[in-house]
Amino acid sequence: MRAFYHHTQTGAALRWGLILPAIGLFAVGFAARRAVPFVPLAALLAATGWAFSSLTVEVTQTRLIWFFGPGLWRKSIEREAIMGVTPVRNPLWYGWGIHLTPRGWLYNVGGLDAVELALNNGRTLRIGSDETAALARALM
């Protein structure tokens, strides 16, 4: 189904915050000539940085779809399950990534802005975006 809203937000701080330490671990491992303990951790950090390098949000006629990075992990909900849409600003301590907050699940790669969705099952979730007004309009 064709999306009438599609936006990808790049999470530069999150990406580089994981990839730069990975490069450092590779360098330390090879300089110490003991790469074995460093390489797996460096590879894990680099893979995590790649997997969470961006957040893509799509709104189709019937669904809201979002995924991180290349789309290895996807989430979606029916639009009819969304009872309310509110642009919000997250506190700094909510952070980035995928995690449970006092306001429900948060999916975010950067910045503090998000759209809070009130669902018909009584739960809420927040999807981070640097285009909160456009995303909120697409969902209304």
What positions do the PLM features span?
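N-terminal membrane-targeting/pre-transmembrane regions
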Residues: 1-32, 106-112, 119, 124, ...
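Contiguous hydrophobic segments
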Residues: 8, 12-16, 58, 63, ...
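Short, small/hydrophobic-residue-rich motifs at membrane-helix boundaries and re-entrant hairpins
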Residues: 14-23, 41-44, 48-51
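Structural signature of transmembrane alpha-helix termini at the membrane-water interface
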Residues: 27-34, 49-53
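Short, aromatic-rich membrane-interface segments at the entry and exit
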Residues: 33-41
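Conserved beta-hairpin
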Residues: 42-84
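Non-transmembrane, membrane-adjacent beta-strand/coil modules in membrane-associated proteins
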Residues: 66-131
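Short, well-ordered, aromatic-rich surface patches in folded extracellular/luminal domains
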Residues: 139
